[in-house]
């Protein structure tokens, strides 16, 4: 660690959207953002779970627009930066400009781990706006460390000043994480930061985040009570407690985070965010974590097991954006019964 302070990036108000079908009220957003700000996290990501303009038939409609959520958070935050997520093809540079005007100062431009080339315009425009611009390589387990590093290098070339390893499926272990960070560090400029976004489907979210920091990672994503897709993200309060015991600098108030997790976030969960049969299947099969709620809906509709649908999606190597295929897979399984 060399005494450097970790950058703590909270994702409760973006990835956490998946856990409650994108239904945060504006008051929920204000309360959670204020609690996070008071606890001194560095950034607070706010958007539909699938990023700017994710509200749709395919991904699920949000209770509010991205801009309403961003403005609600920006109104109460005094210290942290407001971040947002953009997936090229869903969000546009027009949406990015609107998010900037609403108060977002950090953007994570997210692509599948082999498709960094679709992010060039969005990264370049974010830099022109003066945003803290991050490249976000989703489903990082689906390519080799060497290929991931090549994609990271592309994003760096477009202007991203931080590149994330993103374990969207919660499918990686500590060795997988170490290999990917070593590969990135070997090709990126020394001044380019790296970040880790974990999911907890194999209960390794905190361990993988610690392994990333040991390999020189600068920024860590986490969420209150793990609020996120699948079994959730690395639980923020657990990660802070663990690294505090290691003597690492994080700048956050552990007890304030513990209170916010239990008092503000956990009561909102209509489906517990935890490792269970379905979320473990996500991690084991290497499936995009936000498929969980969609699969459970399809399973109920067609009289199937959500686990069977998830495992089949994993076999077919489905990735984020292919939510429409969940029903196709369910119908295939039903017809083959």
Curated annotation (Swiss-Prot):
Pathways involved: Aromatic compound metabolism; 3-phenylpropanoate degradation
Swiss-Prot/TrEMBL site (Transition state stabilizer) positions: 14
Pfam families: DmpG_comm, HMGL-like
Active site positions: 18
SUPFAM superfamilies to which the protein is assigned, alphabetical: Aldolase, post-HMGL domain-like
Similarity comment text for this entry: Belongs to the 4-hydroxy-2-oxovalerate aldolase family.
Binding site for substrate: 14-15, 168, 197, 288
UniProt keyword terms in alphabetical order: Aromatic hydrocarbons catabolism, Lyase, Manganese, Metal-binding
EC number: 4.1.3.39
Originating organism: Escherichia coli O157:H7 (strain EC4115 / EHEC)
Domain Pyruvate carboxyltransferase positions: 6-258
Record text on subunit structure and interactions: Interacts with MhpF.
Protein name: 4-hydroxy-2-oxovalerate aldolase
InterPro entries for the chain: 2-IPM_HCS-like (IPR050073), 4OH_2_O-val_aldolase (IPR017629), Aldolase_TIM (IPR013785), DmpG_comm (IPR012425), DRE_TIM_HOA (IPR035685), PYR_CT (IPR000891)
Residues that coordinate or bind Mn(2+): 15, 197, 199
Reactions that this protein is recorded to catalyse: (S)-4-hydroxy-2-oxopentanoate = acetaldehyde + pyruvate
Highest taxon of source: Bacteria
Role: Catalyzes the retro-aldol cleavage of 4-hydroxy-2-oxopentanoate to pyruvate and acetaldehyde. Is involved in the meta-cleavage pathway for the degradation of aromatic compounds.
GO BP terms: 3-phenylpropionate catabolic process; L-leucine biosynthetic process
GO molecular function, one term: manganese ion binding
